[in-house]
């Protein structure tokens, strides 16, 4: 059977077809409408499988699934359908033709013609062995998680090496740490992170190592080379960005210079930069009330080695962490051990040296930090779905240590920071954990938010994560609302001034991350667009700034990036094939012949693919795209000046679902009705297979509501009637045409939706909120176009009802506040547990995000160019390997 014949017989129907790809072990299996293993033999026996058709087949004993193709031949009597009693009902459209081959007969918006013609016919995606290997490698990261994997710090190892023997004998307690220092000197005589040279870091590490070796009279040649390096490079600190100064540098470096002087090291003690650093230390010390140092845990505990001559160590022992450390700093703890010989300090250091082969990181543990940042990276790269169970375990681990006042980078930390707290808050909240806004209260003072309680500074990454967390606010969370405003203003100022660099991390493209957050906040961020953007921003060589530079291999590594790129390209290839089907369907419905209709097949499919990108959501995407196209042409039909009497006949035909009623209507009305009629019937058949029951009446009801509301607006326009704001919104929230798209798609989200769910208050509430958000956003950006068509908008009505409002801008600001309040409520409803499945509520949320993205600055749906770049990124431009 030829493709054209199949399309004709299908009468505007379309089903899902999948390229061959692997469904990886451990991934939730949700393939509504896809052939099940039990159906495969049935299909083969009846010779109903086409060479290009995809079926779901399991690998015996492996627990994995893959998509395979069928043999040649089709039962001619089936006319494109399976015989009665089979498990599926309709063959997918074959994929022999590329876009190039059918471009001459299928029509899309002119803006996409050139792009579609340039698109190459990609090879079918096959079982990707490499992807399986990368997934397993990442799973090993999860399995091996303990208290965190982190690179070594010469600085901290040097302080540990300085600890004298605890039995009173002459010599070091940890002599193998001295050997590690000798073995890890770099070729130019310094110590530090080999992949990046920063003056502050190299000088600080080198000075600490030279002092340790000189203290015990070992490694004379290493000491000499280290001193030569210091003599030549101390001045280079003047050229360094102050943001790259190690943690506590102004406190610890002058103290080490005093130690070096006492050892007789030949260094330029009078250098201007050293005098400046010493002056900064004095300034900071004057601000530190020593009585408070002994009373409350502060970040100063992390740098006690810089105060070892000033503090009372016995008093400080009361602030020791449970694991024996001082705020998880090996250097600070080693210094405490020198003065107190405390057994808990010794145990902490000894365990570190065993784990890390006689060296130390700059901080340990980092268990919460590692888990949170790893989950965040996997999500932003778009590959978190492969690790749902592992991610859940990670977040449960974090929640175990969650406190009302927030968290730090390590479990049971006595000091919390806004960066880790914000990251945890956002991830926990969006995964359904109960977290409250009060966790940010200690970081808020005098209208500003800070990194640590009691401090007066901000970091770009800390405010970046605070901004992301604050965007998930619920109704009534005033502190989070303040955090959202403050962090957004802070980030905007930094970005405008080209100051997007950070004191905690040196990353590939922090400015780009900030720009995306400002342009597409959570309400407007389409998942696949975020993934594609972050693929360019993710740095496999990102380096954090602690007391020395360090790396987190479970957070930034090449395997994440390889899997993310392969996954994006795999999904994109599938999406291109599906887009071909949507364009074919649009042509078979003859919608191109409708003079009044915008051609938006590509944009409609993009909206679905950018939010429901997973391969198993294929049928949901195709239903979404078809319904979106239908709402577009219906909207144009009702808006282009069609006589109201004709509209009433059209509405009656839809209401009764009777094609005979359109016999007297113009040809274009007939084309539109039959396209709607046949497509909804086809979707009803597909939904029957997905839901195992008839939902046709629900589907017809969605379209009946839509065209009834559109007719009401047409009658208002004809009569010149201006409704009240509430009266308008009651009708316009339906006429914005989101409900048929969303609610039809829900039947293909992987869950059975019974009548109790569809009739529930929760179900109708989330749809109402989405409708309200969509209508107001559409009105704000489209009011001029609507006015030219004789239609009224919420902006116009609001101004007429509130004559005291001095300007259109103020009216819009009020309406945007309504949108914001609705989004807060929608966020709450989506993230809390209700009878409506979470995957279904996610589709509601995604529609609200789509409306924000499309109507952010302009009417992006009607515009020919506003969304072009984003569409190309998601659908047409593969990620370079």
UniProtKB/Swiss-Prot annotation:
Catalyzed reactions per annotation: (2E,6E,10E)-geranylgeranyl diphosphate = ent-copalyl diphosphate; ent-copalyl diphosphate = ent-kaur-16-ene + diphosphate; ent-copalyl diphosphate = ent-beyerene + diphosphate; ent-copalyl diphosphate = ent-sandaracopimara-8(14),15-diene + diphosphate
The protein's annotated pathway: Secondary metabolite biosynthesis; terpenoid biosynthesis
Named cofactor requirement(s): Mg(2+)
Motif DDXXD motif boundaries: 635-639
Targeting signal (transit peptide) range: 1-41
Principal place of residence: plastid
Residues annotated as binding Mg(2+) 3: 635, 639
Binding site for Mg(2+) 1: 417, 419
GO molecular function: ent-copalyl diphosphate synthase activity; ent-isokaurene synthase activity; ent-kaurene synthase activity; ent-sandaracopimaradiene synthase activity; magnesium ion binding; terpene synthase activity
Disruption phenotype: Lost ability to convert geranylgeranyl diphosphate (GGPP) into diterpenoids.
Disulfide cysteine pairs (residue numbers): none
Entry GO terms, CC: chloroplast
Record text on cofactor binding: Binds 4 Mg(2+) ions per subunit.
Subcellular location as annotated: Plastid, Chloroplast
Family annotation (InterPro entries): Isoprenoid_synthase_dom_sf (IPR008949), Terpene_cyclase-like_1_C (IPR034741), Terpene_cyclase_plant_C1 (IPR044814), Terpene_synth_N (IPR001906), Terpene_synth_N_sf (IPR036965), Terpene_synthase-like (IPR050148), Terpene_synthase_metal-bd (IPR005630), Terpenoid_cyclase/PrenylTrfase (IPR008930)
Biological process (GO), any one: ent-kaurene biosynthetic process
Motif (DXDDTA motif): 417-422
Annotated family: Belongs to the terpene synthase family.
The protein's name in its UniProt record: Ent-kaurene synthase CPS/KS, chloroplastic
Organism in which the protein naturally occurs: Physcomitrium patens
């Amino acid at each position: 059977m030829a493709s054209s014949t199949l399309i004709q017989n299908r009468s505007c129907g379309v089903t899902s077809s999948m390229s061959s790809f692997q469904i990886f072990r451990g991934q939730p299996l949700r393939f509504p409408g896809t052939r099940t293993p039990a159906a495969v033999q049935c299909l083969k026996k009846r010779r109903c499988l086409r060479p290009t058709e995809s079926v779901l087949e399991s690998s015996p004993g492996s627990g994995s699934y893959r998509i395979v193709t069928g043999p040649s031949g089709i039962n001619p009597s089936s006319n494109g359908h399976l015989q009665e009693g089979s498990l599926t009902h309709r063959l997918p459209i074959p994929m022999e033709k590329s876009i190039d081959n059918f471009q001459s007969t299928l029509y899309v918006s002119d803006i996409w013609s050139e792009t579609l013609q340039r698109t190459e016919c990609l090879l079918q995606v096959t079982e990707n062995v490499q992807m399986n290997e990368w997934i397993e490698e990442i799973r090993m990261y999860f399995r091996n998680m303990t208290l965190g994997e982190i690179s070594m710090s010469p600085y901290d190892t040097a302080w540990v090496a300085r600890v004298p023997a605890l039995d009173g004998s002459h010599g070091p307690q940890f002599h193998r740490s001295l050997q590690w220092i000798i073995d890890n000197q770099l070729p130019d005589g310094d110590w530090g992170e080999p992949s990046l040279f920063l003056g502050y870091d190299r000088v600080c590490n080198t000075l600490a190592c030279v002092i340790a070796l000189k203290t015990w009279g070992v490694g004379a040649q290493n000491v000499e080379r280290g001193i030569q390096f210091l003599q030549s490079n101390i001045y280079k600190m003047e050229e360094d960005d102050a943001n790259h100064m190690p943690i506590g540098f102004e406190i610890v470096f002058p103290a080490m210079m005093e130690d070096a002087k006492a050892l007789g090291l030949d260094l330029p003690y009078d250098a201007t930069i050293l005098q400046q650093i010493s002056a900064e230390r004095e300034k900071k010390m004057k601000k530190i009330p020593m009585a408070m140092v002994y009373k409350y845990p502060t970040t100063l505990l992390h740098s006690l080695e810089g105060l070892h001559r000033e503090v009372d160590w016995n008093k400080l022992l009361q602030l020791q962490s449970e694991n024996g450390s001082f705020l998880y700093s090996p250097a600070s703890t080693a210094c405490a051990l020198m003065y107190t010989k405390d057994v808990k300090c010794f145990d902490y250091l000894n365990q570190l040296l065993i784990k890390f082969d006689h060296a130390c990181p700059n901080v340990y543990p980092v268990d919460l930090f590692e888990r949170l940042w790893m989950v965040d990276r996997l999500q932003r790269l778009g590959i978190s779905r492969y690790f749902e169970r592992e991610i859940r375990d990670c977040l449960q681990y974090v929640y175990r240590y969650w406190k009302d006042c927030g968290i730090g980078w390590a479990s049971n930390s006595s000091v919390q920071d806004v960066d880790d707290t914000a990251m945890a808050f956002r991830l926990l909240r969006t995964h359904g954990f109960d977290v409250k806004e009060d966790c940010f209260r200690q970081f808020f003072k005098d209208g500003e938010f800070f990194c640590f309680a009691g401090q007066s500074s901000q970091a770009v990454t800390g405010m970046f994560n605070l901004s992301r967390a604050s965007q998930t606010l619920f109704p009534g969370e005033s502190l989070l609302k303040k955090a959202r405003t403050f962090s957004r203003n802070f980030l905007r100022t930094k970005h405008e001034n080209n100051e997007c660099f950070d004191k905690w991390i040196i990353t590939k493209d922090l400015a780009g991350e900030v720009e995306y957050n400002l342009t597409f906040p959570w309400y407007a961020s389409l998942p696949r667009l975020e993934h594609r953007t972050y693929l360019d921003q993710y740095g496999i060589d990102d380096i954090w700034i602690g007391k020395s530079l360090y790396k987190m291999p479970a957070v930034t590594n090449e395997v994440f990036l390889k899997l993310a790129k392969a996954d994006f390209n795999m999904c994109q290839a599938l999406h291109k094939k599906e887009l071909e089907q949507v364009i074919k369907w649009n042509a078979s419905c003859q919608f191109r012949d409708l003079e009044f209709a915008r051609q938006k097949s590509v944009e409609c499919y993009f909206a679905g693919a950018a939010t429901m990108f997973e391969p198993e959501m294929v049928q949901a995407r195709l239903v979404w795209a078809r319904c979106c196209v239908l709402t577009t042409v219906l909207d144009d039909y009702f808006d282009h000046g069609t006589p109201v009497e004709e509209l009433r006949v059209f509405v009656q035909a839809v209401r009764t679902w009777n094609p005979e009623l359109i016999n007297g209507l113009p040809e274009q009305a007939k084309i539109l009705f039959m396209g709607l009629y046949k497509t909804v019937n086809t979707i009803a058949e597909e939904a029957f297979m997905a839901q195992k029951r008839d939902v046709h009446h629900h589907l017809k009801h969605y379209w009946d509501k839509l065209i009834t509301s559109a007719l009401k607006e047409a009658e208002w326009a004809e009569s010149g009637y201006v409704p009240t704001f509430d009266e308008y919104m009651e009708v316009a929230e339906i006429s914005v045409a989101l409900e048929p798209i969303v609610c039809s798609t829900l039947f293909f989200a992987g869950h059975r939706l019974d009548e109790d769910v569809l009739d529930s208050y929760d179900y109708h509430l989330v749809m109402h909120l989405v409708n309200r958000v969509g209508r107001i956003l559409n009105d704000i950006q489209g009011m001029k176009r609507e006015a030219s068509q004789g239609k009224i908008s919420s902006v116009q009505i609001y101004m007429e009802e509130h004559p005291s409002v001095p300007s259109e801008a103020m009216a819009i600001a009020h309406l945007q506040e309504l949108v914001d309040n609705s989004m807060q409520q929608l966020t709450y409803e989506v993230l809390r547990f209700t009878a409506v499945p979470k995957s279904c509520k996610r589709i509601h949320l995604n529609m609200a995000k789509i409306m924000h993205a499309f109507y952010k600055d302009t009417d992006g749906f009607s515009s020919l160019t506003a969304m072009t770049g984003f569409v190309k990124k998601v659908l047409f431009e593969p990620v370079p390997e």
